[in-house]
């Protein structure tokens, strides 16, 4: 009889807990939707919440008493579930109580961005966090599709990423309400989670229905298209395929002799072209000599006499005897002798009596090595082919030659082979932008500072490694800084971010900050507006906009 009565008491209590939680949720929703300026109504709702939570706390104490006994094993899971629901309501009431005790413009309210009283701001924050999570997941999937060379999935992801970034920017700039994003949240989430399923059906016009569809190629500042100007996902894919195909098969522009005579060539590239042109190599007349791209001259591999052309012409030896003659360079004994004689007469080192005999003996001993071989074994051909094809792509290939003039270089050398040590220090009289003019360098690396004088220049900016760091993007620099702690490379990455990219390092939270200055249209009261961004290296690995509560304190930032 007592067991039956206990079961009846448990059922009655669980019914009261269910009703109490429903009443608590209704009051809590009213509190969240109430205007923060209506303090009297919010205080009344707070007292109602307090009354309901006290009832639930009594029920929780009774549930804890029953759980300590062994007579309720069949109801133990149900009692634990209701206990957790009551404790969840207690936590929510604590947050409401803390929110009501916090004054609007107190130090705690200004320094804590999580304390948001405006319901619209709460919705906006939730949607911004949702889009951030979707972008992070899509970026991970995009990297996988790019590694698998899946062009169709890559194009779809690029389209969605571009539109989500546009929505995120509009939300942050208050150009878009969070309600449309909340309405289509399930559709966006469905694509992010199920886009690789075989039965997946894509919602092509989701961003068009939201009124903010853009093309991936357009910038974030572009206004959303309206009416007939809006394009579907299928048309964007077809246009992107048409854009990609000519990029892969773009014809190289021929440069005539007159164009080459008037085109300024960097000293490093000019010396490389002279050394290559001095070596007789088979050149096809139908192939353009070199292509002009990005203000630098790159040589076409098909025009150089490589072991590949040597092997292919050896295969045609029986068909055409005239082609066989191209494989063997002419006798250059006289040319080498004249070069050595010229070096002996012009260089001051050969006139020194202390080194005169030794240098002449050294040149005579190297004479045989400087003469190209008339014939080459197949094994040597294969070794040269593999070595040239696997030659490292040096990032300092455009470094200027600091010697006056080399001795004869009869054998062809890859133009991408490094001609300077990796940490070679340049003298002050050699400018750092020999191969690129000042405007191109500023545009390429995003610099807005003027060229520094020799006194302001330091030794680190004159090393090849520092010049390499100038070519890295922000993701690479941040990766080196956070993952190569205590190394020389970390110092160079920090120096590049601070001096050339204008980022500031905060010693307190160990984050990098960047100040943006946006010019406002006339009539706004002020000409420009400042905003701060920080690099989130802990969660998203993205540069995010700082909140309105961010205060710049110069003492917290490191100075290099």
Curated annotation (Swiss-Prot):
Cross-link (Glycyl lysine isopeptide (Lys-Gly) (interchain with G-Cter in ubiquitin)) at residue(s): 338
Residues bearing PTM Phosphothreonine: 306
GO annotation (BP), single: nuclear-transcribed mRNA poly(A) tail shortening
Annotated positions of the Phosphoserine modification: 377
Assigned keywords, A-Z: Activator, Coiled coil, Cytoplasm, Isopeptide bond, Nucleus, Phosphoprotein, Repressor, Transcription, Transcription regulation, Ubl conjugation
Biased composition (Polar residues): 215-237, 299-311
Subcellular location per the Swiss-Prot or TrEMBL entry: Cytoplasm; Nucleus
Protein name: General negative regulator of transcription subunit 5
Note: Present with 5110 molecules/cell in log phase SD medium.
Assembly and interaction partners: Forms a NOT protein complex that comprises NOT1, NOT2, NOT3, NOT4 and NOT5. Subunit of the 1.0 MDa CCR4-NOT core complex that contains CCR4, CAF1, NOT1, NOT2, NOT3, NOT4, NOT5, CAF40 and CAF130. In the complex interacts with NOT1 and NOT2. The core complex probably is part of a less characterized 1.9 MDa CCR4-NOT complex.
Region spans: Disordered: 212-330
């Amino acid at each position: 009889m007592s067991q039956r009565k206990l079961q009846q008491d448990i059922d009655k209590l669980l019914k009261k807990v269910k009703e109490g939680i429903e009443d608590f949720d209704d009051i809590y929703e009213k509190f969240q939707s109430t205007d923060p300026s209506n303090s009297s109504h919010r205080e009344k709702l707070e007292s109602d919440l307090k009354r309901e939570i006290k009832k639930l706390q009594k029920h929780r104490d009774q549930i804890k008493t029953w759980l300590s006994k062994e007579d309720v094993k069949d109801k133990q899971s149900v009692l634990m579930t209701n206990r957790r629901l009551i404790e969840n309501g207690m936590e929510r009431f604590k947050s409401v109580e803390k929110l009501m005790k916090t004054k609007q413009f107190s130090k705690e309210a200004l320094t804590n961005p999580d304390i948001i009283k405006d319901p619209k701001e709460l919705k906006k924050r939730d949607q911004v966090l949702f889009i951030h999570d979707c972008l992070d997941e899509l970026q991970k999937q995009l990297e996988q599709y790019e590694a698998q060379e899946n062009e169709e999935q890559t194009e779809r992801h690029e389209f969605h990423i571009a539109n989500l970034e546009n929505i995120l920017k509009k939300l942050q700039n208050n150009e878009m309400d969070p309600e449309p994003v909340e309405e289509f949240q399930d559709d966006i989430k469905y694509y992010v989670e199920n886009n690789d399923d075989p039965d997946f059906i894509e919602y092509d016009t989701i961003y068009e229905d939201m009124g903010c569809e853009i093309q991936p190629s357009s910038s974030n500042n572009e206004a959303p298209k309206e009416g007939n100007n809006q394009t579907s996902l299928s048309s964007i894919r077809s246009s992107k395929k048409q854009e990609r195909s000519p990029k892969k098969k773009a014809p190289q522009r021929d440069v005539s002799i007159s164009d080459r005579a008037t085109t300024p060539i960097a000293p490093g590239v000019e010396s490389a072209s002279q050394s290559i042109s001095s070596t007789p190599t088979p050149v096809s007349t139908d192939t353009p000599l070199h292509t002009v791209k990005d203000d630098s001259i790159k040589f076409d591999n098909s025009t150089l006499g490589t072991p590949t052309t040597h092997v292919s012409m050896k295969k045609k030896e029986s068909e055409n005897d005239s082609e066989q003659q191209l494989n063997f360079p002419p006798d250059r004994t006289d040319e080498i002798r004249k070069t050595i004689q010229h070096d002996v007469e012009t260089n001051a080192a050969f006139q020194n009596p202390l080194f005169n005999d030794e240098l002449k003996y050294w040149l005579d001993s190297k004479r045989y090595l400087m003469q190209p071989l008339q014939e080459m074994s197949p094994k040597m051909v294969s070794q040269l082919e593999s070595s040239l094809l696997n030659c490292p792509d040096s990032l300092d290939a455009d470094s200027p030659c600091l010697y006056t003039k080399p001795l004869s270089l009869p054998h062809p050398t890859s133009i991408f082979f490094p001609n300077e040590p990796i940490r070679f220090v340049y003298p002050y009289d050699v400018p750092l932008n020999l191969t690129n003019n000042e405007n191109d360098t500023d545009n390429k690396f995003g610099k807005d500072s003027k060229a520094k004088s020799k006194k302001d220049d330091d030794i680190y900016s004159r090393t090849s490694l520092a010049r390499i760091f100038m070519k890295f993007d922000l993701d690479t620099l941040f990766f080196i800084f956070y993952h190569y702690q205590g190394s020389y490379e970390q110092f160079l990455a920090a120096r590049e971010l601070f001096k050339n990219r204008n980022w500031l390092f905060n010693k307190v939270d160990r984050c990098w900050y960047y100040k943006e200055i946006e010019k406002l249209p006339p009539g706004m009261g002020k000409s420009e507006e400042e905003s701060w961004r920080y690099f989130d290296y802990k969660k998203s690995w993205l540069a995010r906009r700082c909140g309105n509560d961010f205060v710049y304190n110069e003492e917290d930032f490191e100075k290099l």
